[in-house]
């Protein structure tokens, strides 16, 4: 579908605004003139690249009056360039020409994206926008900002996709066709707008492993890479990262086994009441979709310093219409990706007992637990967690816990299959801590190990060194 004439005129003006001029003549107060490329302008100085390729900083007050005026004009023009990006996207993404020196919380504040997770080194902000909201004149279904060491690190925007599309309980052929057309339409619109603004894209591929590898179209602007991914009948997404990260195909710096082992051990928290649990696990809110498996894997992978995105993992898990995913498909696809990061995924068919959980939590390793999350189970978990928060007499709580465990029987509801993380244990009370991908309110709930075994599917998974 062609864009309207008004939008085409807007894009034409954006193209003109985004053009980068090179070869600027500047002179000092002595009258010496040189040809340079202006790289960066600060209030008191400018960064320039000389004809021989060397880069240096020069004090603005040492320039001639004409050059100072010219630099001020360039500064004004440069400031307007980030505004054209904001106008193109339709959101206040930038406050200047560099997103990557902004703190993640400030970016999220101006975007009005809510905090999802905050750890010692990582943060994330996520929003599921209303149906009438638009980015790049296209409806986004999910928007996320990731921070690393306090600074903005990655923006992920998911447009039309199989998991978020509105279907009946039994999808009709017309609904499926509408989804396919929406994915195709969104891709065409995004490609046209980005190409009109930045020129023809480069082709690039990301990822390793069946179902995880993506073919991307890439546009660059002033250290920002705009990466559009589309899978037929699956999804369309746009990621914004630094050009340096994009050149490295989004891979993070690999940690040695020793460095990662030290990091995971440092994440272990021991409380006076005997609780032992793992901190600094990123939270992901899967939203209304049945994305518990990919969301849980994203949390674990990011905890292990491996970049991950639940939408891409969902594609690897052969997402069903409406959002259901296959654990076995995700594991088969993720296994090679994890191996490429020098890590190993293990499946263990062990009962849910405190001594089993303790072996891995004491190494700083969370456990992916497949279970049945019925209404009865969640009522039980919520009630126990609420009661637990008010406890001061832990000896009495131990007695109460043991008595309740013997009297409580939870049934396996096969219609409520779920995956979550086991993140802690209490050896004295016989409890384990679980964490679900439903947002901060579900980051830590405590249940008895006996009841956990009653609703377990029989398998646990972990990623090790």
Predicted regions and their residues:
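Predominantly the structural core of cysteine protease catalytic domains
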Residues: 323-427
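Compositionally biased alpha-helical segments
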Residues: 18-91
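Noncatalytic regulatory segments and standalone regulatory/sensor domains
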Residues: 220, 238-273, 395-465
